[in-house]
């Protein structure tokens, strides 16, 4: 009996030691990055791609109708774009608009995903686009020019009578702002669904565990330990979100703030209904927030406002006198002249391209790093859960043998 007890206790200690080692390794997983461990990170990222591909194949195997409709849509799109026919004249008319919609929605998604490490496409793309439209409209005193396609930003033959108003410029850029905002709302969906699924699984496991504990050892309410502050707060948060509801989420989504980066995870975790979450997020981000940012850029890059600001800066900082104004004049000359597409880029243009390249590279690396870290931590969590279940099975045996 004594020998048997010693073996059981030894196994229990080994399991606890292994759990501790895995917990420590989980912390070290955060240091696995493409920059420091390129071979290891690339290897695990390929495993993730393989698992994702297998999961996708299994998903569509159980949903043949969905696969059929996706294939049908892709086939019709291919025929409409590439097969010659009468429909091509209509496609030519709307193809630029469709491609631009896809472009801005895609940039919005890239800006929203990544939990704060996403590609800040408003600063890199939408903001400069709105600024360019504003500069062109106020310089030419007209909004009768294309902003997309081969014939974009060509000076109109005549100026508009009565001048260009703020609202005219806003109408010129509002579709780009709307589609970009829609993309940022769509980018909140993956973390919402992941958190919602994890929460539902967790609730099921938690309910089963509580039921098992109640069956094995019933406890009176008086004997139950007092709940900690964190437990009490976690119970009140869902009620708080429920009380805020649609308009609370709408208010958070409408104001540019870093607190909304975790909105998808938060709402998914507390099981906020999908349409309440997505509807409020879509209106807040696409209609309100994107237009607030667009209005700010239009006001800031109006030629008159810009000239006043530059004059003020040059008066206050003598070092910058006659250095900012020539840059503005150069941009005005670019707008008023037809520049060859093959003309060499300026130093500023090359520097901006380098900034874009570095930002996109960092964004892609952060996706790889976070995916690999999450994959490795999940593997460790599964091992820990398995060891804990073994430990729970051994503890009753140990109790019986001690008796």
Curated annotation (Swiss-Prot):
A cellular-component GO term for this protein: membrane
Cellular compartment(s): Membrane; Endoplasmic reticulum
Major subcellular location class: membrane
Catalysed reactions, semicolon-separated: a 1,2-diacyl-sn-glycero-3-phospho-L-serine(in) = a 1,2-diacyl-sn-glycero-3-phospho-L-serine(out); cholesterol(in) = cholesterol(out); a 1,2-diacyl-sn-glycero-3-phosphocholine(in) = a 1,2-diacyl-sn-glycero-3-phosphocholine(out); a 1,2-diacyl-sn-glycero-3-phosphoethanolamine(in) = a 1,2-diacyl-sn-glycero-3-phosphoethanolamine(out)
Coiled coil regions in record: 7-33
Bilayer topology: Multi-pass membrane protein
Record flagged with keyword Endoplasmic reticulum: yes
Disruption phenotype: Mutant cells display defects in the protein secretory pathway and in organelle biogenesis, and are deficient in their ability to initiate development upon starvation. The contractile vacuole, which is necessary to survive under hyperosmotic conditions, is non-functional in mutant cells.
Transmembrane segments annotated in the record for this chain: 65-85, 102-122, 150-170, 175-195, 240-260, 263-283, 294-314, 348-368
Physiological role: Phospholipid scramblase involved in lipid homeostasis and membrane dynamics processes. Required for autophagosome formation: participates in early stages of autophagosome biogenesis at the endoplasmic reticulum (ER) membrane by reequilibrating the leaflets of the ER as lipids are extracted. In addition to autophagy, involved in other processes in which phospholipid scramblase activity is required.
Family to which the UniProt record says this protein belongs: Belongs to the VMP1 family.
Protein known as: Vacuole membrane protein 1 homolog
Source organism per UniProt: Dictyostelium discoideum
